Amino acid sequence: MYRQAKWDEPLIFELSRPGRVGYTLPKPIEDVDVEIPEKLKRKSPLNLPEVSEPEVVKHYTRLSEMNYGVDSGIYPLGSCTMKYNPKINEELAGHPKVAYIHPYQDERTVQGALRIMWELEQWLKEITGMDRFTLQPAAGANGEFTGVMIIKAYHLDRGETQRNEMLVPDSAHGTNPASAAMAGFKVIEIPSNENGTVDLEALENAVSERTAGLMLTNPNTLGIFEDEIEEIAKIVHKAGGLLYYDGANLNGILGKVRPGDMGFDIVHLNLHKTFSTPHGGGGPGAGPVGVKEFLKDYLPVPLVSYDEENDRYYLDYDVPKSIGKVKELFGNFAVLVRALTYLKVMGKDGLREVSEVAVLNANYLARKLKGTRGYELPHKELRKHEVVFSAEPMKRETGVRTLDVAKRLLDFGMHAPTIYFPLIVHEALMIEPTETVSKEELDAYVEAMKKISEEAYTNPEVVKSAPHNTAVRRVDDVLASKKPIITWKMYKELKEKGEVDY
């Protein structure tokens, strides 16, 4: 049984002692203070913790022992693709020639960086079947917003101002309707059929002259491939709408089929999912957006282009109908470096094998867990990269909820799957093992879930009160949402007001 380290660790500010240092700056040759205009000088010293280097190392080492990540063990968050991040990615992203360049440098001095971005775009075009990419968006949701703004600009440019409706399946990621709403669209939900895929009749009834587009994930969030995608594309395009691809689940079809060949007009990808760059904790990520030829003039500026005649890469602002910038400068460059490293190391054959093993792992786990008391598998049996179980029978028969199952999994030293999503599955457990998990790890995960099932029916309180072996047990999610304390300054202010007692 797993037991996580538990330290009564203070905040680093609480370790601070006046005069204690971990780094000494060289003595300035001249009096720097004289050169700084008075209006730019601070009125008070920086409020930084004064600690030694050994104290800093020990502090963060202890905190890391109370954490769990992809290097700790299986991390099967559904639709998150928490795969192993190869360390060569980090080595190249941290290389001085990458780390020490500046986005304001003359483009003649950063030809290597521009080439990295241009080469990455060529890979992404080939993988998706798109004709042009922007690498600017900083995350998947940022990419979604970029995509729907391009859809909006396209229709407005054609004078079709009535197209104010965005169609979104009921199995979609929550950010899809949010991104559409942020762009000013009215969101129309399309129900799923008994197979867990888009209901074509409902789609036919929903499209009209007001339809701007359909946002679709394929495979969808149930891990099921939308096998009627060609018909879906025909329906949307016949109505004058555009088809948008949410690339969250690209890992399930990588190297097998391309969104552009299915009829999609716009795609966003998650480099921090499919292409092994680190994610979680708020970033950094990258959500490049690709489009077909007829939409390229709406992409954010600048793009990275290559002048073959003069053999140089340059920042291209000649994008006549651009929606403008969606992020300052040129995107999260170090993430782009990691993704290109992964692509070059894997190669085309390796990428195809990624999806094959990811699909194999998900279906192996599904087959081994199927039939376990308390869990049921809705919709089709054959899945792509992930599988969604329902713990509704367990809740009904024992009172043990999906949340309890997820918390109990932590006691086995395993990360919980995504829970309560997609919303169309009650008491959902959404499991995506990825291709970097071994058969032994899959077997252990299934055994843990079977053990939890046994406990739910024989000693449910053990599951309901879990976790028992972690550094932190159940947090107050409501308090964290209503009164977030995310900075030292916020904590001090609330402490002074007596609103926190720790």
UniProtKB/Swiss-Prot annotation:
Catalytic activity from the UniProt record: N(6)-[(R)-lipoyl]-L-lysyl-[glycine-cleavage complex H protein] + glycine + H(+) = N(6)-[(R)-S(8)-aminomethyldihydrolipoyl]-L-lysyl-[glycine-cleavage complex H protein] + CO2
GO terms under cellular component: cytosol; glycine cleavage complex
Keywords: Oxidoreductase, Pyridoxal phosphate
SUPFAM superfamilies attached to this UniProt entry: PLP-dependent transferases
GO biological process, any: glycine decarboxylation via glycine cleavage system
Requisite cofactors: pyridoxal 5'-phosphate
Molecular function GO terms recorded: glycine binding; glycine dehydrogenase (decarboxylating) activity; pyridoxal phosphate binding
The organism's place on the tree of life at top rank: Archaea
Family membership noted in the UniProt record: Belongs to the GcvP family. C-terminal subunit subfamily.
Role summary: The glycine cleavage system catalyzes the degradation of glycine. The P protein binds the alpha-amino group of glycine through its pyridoxal phosphate cofactor; CO(2) is released and the remaining methylamine moiety is then transferred to the lipoamide cofactor of the H protein.
Assembly behavior: The glycine cleavage system is composed of four proteins: P, T, L and H. In this organism, the P 'protein' is a heterodimer of two subunits.
Protein name, entry field: Probable glycine dehydrogenase (decarboxylating) subunit 2
